[in-house]
């Protein structure tokens, strides 16, 4: 079967002068696409991924083609990119999706049997003239509430934390954002309306959601007749988990931006010097504002010896940090169902989080209020109760049943076959 994936990011690399260089931007969707694509390729399918080249290592106006672990990766030049990481640049470029002939030509010349979209539904516009069957798995769509929440957070990046020190406070003007952009993003022609028009049977699109609550959100946002079926995301589950550190340690894995709130994590860690905190992730390359804020935060919090800012790390190394930690801490103001939650559960690591998608946190960790005090209380509770010992078995059992990669990907294959045989709506 010849299968294509469209994702704005992909967790791939290429060797340049002996150094391993990222081929695209990185994030949960990119990693997820990699897991799916490589599993299918390993099963003998012809798999193609269409993504954007990282701007700092690719400048030519032609698509570059790589092969990694059996997957053909088509890298589209950054100058053709639309829907960049920041809302403002993404909105300005969104109207150009229909005219992105370069991307469409690369996409359609492969004669794919199935084309699957893994991230923002705006990418669906790239294939509106494509007649092949398409699958859209809604991972993390923003509804009106989400956008308003993000506007508030981006306009007050540091003001939501309690008791912050004026020496490192990030001024409001360091992070510019227009609420008008957010309104246009959802209320006008740029998002909801064009996507809604595409989600009709004649366009040969099958819709799924990665979590139950996302299915409900999608139904309401796009006024669908029924709620999309949930197809859980896959995760590799290893036979042996990492041994927890003797001294309590905690891990945070995310982008450095207003949604993920690294400042909150750093403030929490600074108030608990007796435990170690490891922060994995970085600001997106295309966002100078986020990069500047990250630098300010790193400079100030470098004085705390229990805070370890690791930046970007390879997947195997990330898994070890998550596995050894007494808990994964998530400080995001809103989320879909993060891949890091699944990775933590696969390692028997509890989750401390304000967001609670499909009650994963309530069932396998501690759901907190959004305050420094609440997070700190949860951290001490994890240590005092050795919560990982109580939850590890339940987490592993659940994740094996609901997210194990072979089970989920065989479900994908069944879906593909039914679509090609005309057996689904």
Language model regions located:
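Conserved donor-binding/catalytic core segment of Leloir-type glycosyltransferases
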Residues: 208, 235, 242-260, 266-269, ...
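Helix-loop-beta element that forms the nucleotide-linked donor phosphate-binding surface
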Residues: 198-209, 215-235
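A charged, aromatic-enriched C-terminal amphipathic alpha-helix characteristic of glycosyltransferases
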Residues: 386-424
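Membrane-proximal helix-turn-helix segments that form the acceptor-binding/catalytic region
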Residues: 36, 142, 157-207
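Short hydrophobic beta-strand element within catalytic cores of glycosyltransferases
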Residues: 341, 350-353
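Nucleotide-activated donor-binding/catalytic signature segment of Leloir-type glycosyltransferases, i.e.
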Residues: 291-313
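Aromatic "clamp/platform" in nucleotide-sugar-dependent glycosyltransferases that forms part
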Residues: 333, 357
């Amino acid at each position: 079967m010849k299968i294509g994936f469209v994702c704005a990011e992909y967790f791939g690399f290429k060797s340049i002068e002996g150094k391993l260089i990222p081929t695209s931007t990185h994030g949960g969707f990119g990693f997820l696409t990699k897991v799916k694509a490589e599993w299918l390729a390993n099963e003998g399918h012809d798999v193609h991924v269409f993504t954007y080249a990282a701007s700092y290592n690719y400048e030519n106006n032609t698509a570059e083609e790589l092969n990694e672990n059996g997957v053909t990766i088509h890298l589209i030049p950054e100058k053709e990119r639309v829907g960049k990481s920041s809302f403002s640049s993404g909105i300005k470029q969104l109207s150009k999706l229909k005219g992105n002939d370069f991307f469409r030509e690369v996409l359609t010349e492969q004669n794919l049997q199935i084309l699957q979209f893994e991230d923002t539904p705006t990418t669906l516009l790239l294939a509106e003239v494509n007649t092949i069957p398409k699958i859209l798995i809604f991972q993390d769509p923003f509804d009106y509430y989400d956008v308003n929440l993000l506007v508030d957070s981006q306009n007050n990046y540091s003001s939501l934390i309690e008791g912050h020190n004026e020496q490192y406070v990030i001024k409001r003007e360091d992070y510019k954002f227009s609420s008008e952009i957010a309104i246009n993003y959802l209320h006008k022609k740029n998002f909801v309306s064009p996507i809604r028009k595409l989600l009709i049977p004649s366009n040969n699109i099958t819709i799924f959601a990665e979590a139950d609550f996302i299915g409900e959100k999608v139904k309401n946002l796009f006024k669908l007749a029924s709620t999309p079926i949930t197809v859980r995301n896959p995760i590799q589950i290893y036979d042996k988990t990492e041994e927890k550190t003797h001294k309590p340690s905690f891990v945070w894995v995310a982008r450095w931006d207003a949604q993920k709130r690294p400042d909150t994590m750093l403030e929490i860690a600074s108030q608990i010097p007796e435990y170690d905190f490891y922060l994995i992730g970085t600001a997106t390359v295309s966002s100078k504002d986020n990069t500047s804020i990250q630098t300010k935060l790193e400079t100030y919090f470098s004085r705390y010896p229990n805070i370890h800012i690791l930046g970007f790390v390879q997947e195997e190394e990330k898994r070890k940090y998550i596995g050894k930690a007494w808990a994964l801490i998530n400080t995001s103001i809103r989320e879909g169902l993060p891949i890091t939650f699944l990775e933590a559960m696969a390692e028997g690591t509890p989750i401390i989080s304000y967001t609670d998608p499909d009650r994963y946190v309530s069932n396998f960790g501690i759901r907190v209020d959004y305050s420094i005090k609440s997070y700190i209380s949860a951290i001490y509770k994890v240590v005092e109760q050795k919560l990982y010992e109580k939850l590890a078995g339940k987490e592993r059992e659940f994740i094996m049943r609901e997210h194990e990669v072979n089970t989920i990907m065989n479900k994908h294959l069944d879906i593909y076959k039914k679509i090609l045989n005309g057996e689904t709506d």
